[in-house]
Each structure stands twice: as C-alpha cells, then as structure tokens.
Amino acid sequence: MKQVNLLLMSAAMTLAACGGTKDAGQAGVPLIERSNIKIEGKRMTPEALWAMGRIGGVAVSPDEKQIAYTVAYYSVPENKSNREVFVMNTDGTGNQQITRTPWQENEVNWIKGGTKLAFLSNESGSSQLWEMNPDGSGRKQLTQYDGDIEGYSFSPDGKKLLFIAQVKTKPSTADKYPDLPKATGIIVTDLMYKHWDEWVTGAPHPFVADFDGNSISNIKDILEGKPYESPMRPWGGIEQLAWSPAGDKVAYTCRKKTGLAYAISTNSDIYIYDLATKKTDNITEENKGYDTNPQYSPDGKYIAWQSMERDGYEADLNRLFIMNLETGEKRFVSKEFESNVDGFLWNKDSKSIYFIGVWHGETQIYNVDLAANDKITQLTDGMYDYASLALAGDKVIALRHSMSMGDEI
C-alpha cells in the first residue's frame, strides 16, 4: 500500500494481517474474524468480496496523533457480521486490533481527553455505551438504558450525552388484542408501515442525559410524546444531530409529519433545541425540501447543513447552506459547484468548509472559502471516490475506494 498526498496513511485492506488483540471472544459464542481466503487465478468471486473487511467510522484523538476505526468481518454460513476496533498512529504506523470479541463494537470515539475510547457494544444483551483504554483493556459499561442505544455524541465539555433510541409511537397487535399473545400479524391502517425490510412500530428519538464520567442520569427525550423521527429513517444516524460548541443547544433533523403526509413529503427541517429553556426553533421553515445533517462552526457563529429545494423530489440537488446565528442570514455556499454535496466538515478556523461531491462520475474532496466569495477549490483527483472526513492538524483524513479496492483510510 502506498501513501498519497492528501491521505495520511493507507490502512491495511483487512485481508492483510493486523496487530495484537485484547479481550478475546467469550467461550461458546461464535467469533467472526478476518478471513484467510486465497484468491485463485486472480478471479474476484462473491466469496472473496465477502471475505474483505469493511472499514467503519474514523475518529481522530484529541492530540491528533492517533486514529481509531472499526472493521466489520462477515460470515456467509452464519449470515452475520462482527465489528472490531483498531487504533493506529496518524502517520500510518502502529496499526493494532485492540478488540477481539463477538460483541459488535462500533461507533468508536475518543473521550476524556483521549484517555478512553467510547463505543457501542451488545455485550450486555442490548446496545449500550461502553469505554475502554486505547489499548483495548479496561472495558467498562457506561449506560444501563432500557433499550438499544443506536448512536451517540458527547457534548464538547463531556458532561452530557446525546443519544438515539427507539420509542413506541403506535400500539402493536398484542396491545390491541391481548387475548392473542402469540399473534405475529401486522395491522396496517396508514403509511408509513415499512421501510425496506423493517416494519415501523416506533420512531427514533434524540435523548439528552447528564454524564458524570461513569453513568448517565436525568434523561430527557427532546421529542417526548411526539410521533416524529429524529434522525429520519431509513438511513439517518447521529450525523443528523449536532451539539453547539457551548454545549447548551442541540440541532436536530426532523420531518414533523405522520401518515400519508409523511410518506409523500421530503420536507424535513433543522430544529435547534435549547437545553435550558426547552424551547425549539425551526431555522429552515421556509425551505420545502430536505434539510439535513446540521453542523455548528467551531466558533459557534454559524451552522451549516445540506438542503434540497423542492418537496417530494428525493433526487433534487443537495446543496450546502450556512446560516449566521446572530443575524439569521442564510447562504447557498456550494452554488459554484453545480452538483451534489454528499458530506461536509468545518475547518477549524470556521472560515472554510471541506466537502465531498460528485463530478463527472468521481467523488472528490473540495474546499469552499467562505471569506473569498465562497470560492471552491478541488483538493483531490483521480479515478477514486472519497467518503468520510476528519481533521488531524493540517491534514484531512478520508476514506477512499475505487473499482479495484474497497474503502481505505
């Protein structure tokens, strides 16, 4: 694997050997690990594709010297996957697998000044938040929430936890007919009753809780009593929620509709919830298409998000917008690009934004200079597609794939 200019390293493609591990799998529980498949005659088969690990989210340590990421391995006979955590230096050296368990470690993030790694795991029987040392030792469960935690984000000061969990929004068949406890049928009276292969029985809600370093308390459902989704199905995750730099507000994405109106509309909005006053403001009410994925600028003066203009048009142009939080002025900052913005990240100085966009069949990384009339500069080139952005000093960390290789860092 060779280094390229923008990337700091090229992570081993998960068919190659990795470093030492911690916390071996539990006895009696199948452990899905890296496959040792051999490709004969240079033929790419379905089995070879499933043998490749899939790199997950990348998190940079606060001192910007290390990267934590996950890799998912697959078992065709078991029809399951398992995700493990790896840590490496930002120059690509010292790559080590730090977990080796059947418990699906995922959504890894650095916490407590970089002394711990937070992650989700189903080791306790449900998806809960855990922490461990950066070498994989000292696993400790942080939450005992009654249900699965599907995503999370700590406030900038680390004293509060924002997390996603399902809430029940409609009665089940068993609720309606308690004398039929074994009934498995679904009673459908309205849309949406299904997303792809998942029946809709509830909605994901954002919760905020106090965190003392060991456990959470004072849990508050931001959408308590409401039938709405935040993040939105079927693909939304923690990227649709954001802390303000001061940790006093949460921005969230929501389409506040139900039934048929929900099913035929793409009119979602960005809402800002004030933790102190419990007041919610809709900052994109005038726009009728998708508004998603809010991000505050590091200096707290602006908020950016992705926006589509027209309601009901899922293939509309995905634009990058910013709003001045003091004046309320909004600006379409990717107008010069004339294509979709697929993801973005504020620069540390709050004066520019990195984004990923498709142009002529390639997904490249760009920078829009907000102080220079939104001038857009293309930073990468070649027959590749980039995904996921993070910053480490003056470097951009990204995932990259092509027709001949899977995602690498």
Tell where the protein language model's regions lie, with residue ranges.
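Predominantly five- to eight-bladed beta-propeller fold
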Residues: 25-32, 83, 166-225, 253-256, ...
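Beta-strand-rich domains and repeat architectures in extracellular enzymes and scaffolds
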Residues: 47-83
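Multi-bladed beta-propeller domains
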Residues: 31-54, 80, 88-104, 121, ...
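Hydrophobic beta-strand positions that form the internal "hydrophobic ladder"
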Residues: 64-67, 114-118, 161-162, 247-250, ...
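Short glycine/acidic-enriched loop and turn motifs that connect beta-strands
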Residues: 73-77, 123-126, 168-171, 257-260, ...
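Residue-level detector of Asp-centered blade-edge/turn motifs that repeat once per structural unit
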Residues: 62-63, 112-113, 156-157, 245-246, ...
